[in-house]
Amino acid sequence: MESVTLSLPEAYDLALEVLSANGFSADHAAAIARNVTAGERDGCASHGLWRLLGIVDTLRKGKVSPDAEPQIHDQAPGIARADAGGAFSLLAYERALPLLLEKARHNGIAALAINRCVHFSALFADIEPLTEAGLVGLACTPSHAWVAPAGGTRPLFGTNPIAFGWPRQDKPPFIVDMATSAAARGEIQLHQRSGKALPEGWGIDSQGQPTTDAAEVLNGAMLTFGGHKGSALAAMVELLAGPLIGDMTSAESLAWDNGAGGLPYGGELILALDPQRFLGAQAPEQLARAETLFMGMQEQGARLPGERRFACRQQSERQGSLSVVHCMMRFAPCARAGKARSAATRMPVKTACRARPARCSRHRPAATSSTYQRSDTGARCRTAEYRRPAHRCPAPGAAYNADP
């Protein structure tokens, strides 16, 4: 398969330039570029640069705001809320994260509800900042109704990912990030692009018959993992990140899309728990017991969740480059143009998952170390002069099938 090799800074520049050229504000473009570059760096091609195609397509269809400023609300002692205003979720999460961390450390447990957001990204990027802060994290979000319930033949659930993270001292965190469907939808789309057959059990066609044809599954329905067990977990996500936080279910998201083919719109729920507040002086001892569990898994030859991703990250950072498949070749000249820039003007991709000041012609990021740093109030400016008509999206609980 044809590919192009990009350095990590070039990959970030590619994403940033594509997003900016299509009308995203500086802050949103930087947040999205950090995320898709991190996915590519970590070997998660289904959530890497390839996602730019769907991101730009959703904007062109008027299904996402390119410049909405997130509104952060201190709702209750243990609850923070971020209204994304119809934009992608990433910037809203970055802006709300300091409040979530503060509440978790004060109360021992805290929740963040992100409302009115368009979502495409892997949840490990939302969980990892919590584990880096020494917290346990849990996140979930619905999507579009693409998945049939166990025993059913028509889409009702979304892929409904769940992510869980556990902090570890001087080691990569233990992070589970999984769809409740048998596979992520992006994986099926990549199979379709490459002409590969799907594994059995991933989906059914429009007549409810099992199939390994990716196109037939995309036109029919995906299946949950583990039959009725995955179906129950998918229903749980619908409730937790839908009605509980006043936002859409996957079926409502698809109805709101009204056939446009945009990315899912709705809410996300993130929980943060502080072991220090739960355990006090016993925290080191109890966290050490968790390490015994991990060792027991590895001694039997089991691979810890996230282990492959962190290995890919180390390899990408060691090599300093990525091989991007042909579906991104159309953007290669844009990335190559970035070679003429000084390295000091490029975003350090090693910390791509973390919030940083947006990059524009007036505010360039300074070189930083490889440790994770977060700027909560970093310099930001808006340079994208292109503006689309104002994006309109329903408030939670509104008529979801309204013409957008």
Where are these regions (language model features)?
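Catalytic-core signal marking the mid-to-C-terminal active-site face
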Residues: 2, 6, 11-14, 250-344
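Active-site cofactor/substrate anionic-group-binding motifs, chiefly glycine-
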Residues: 50-101
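A generic, well-ordered mixed alpha/beta core segment in the N-terminal half of proteins
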Residues: 80-169
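Phosphate/diphosphate-binding glycine-rich loops and adjacent basic-rich segments that engage nucleotide
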Residues: 147-215
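Small-residue-enriched flexible segments
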Residues: 185-246, 263
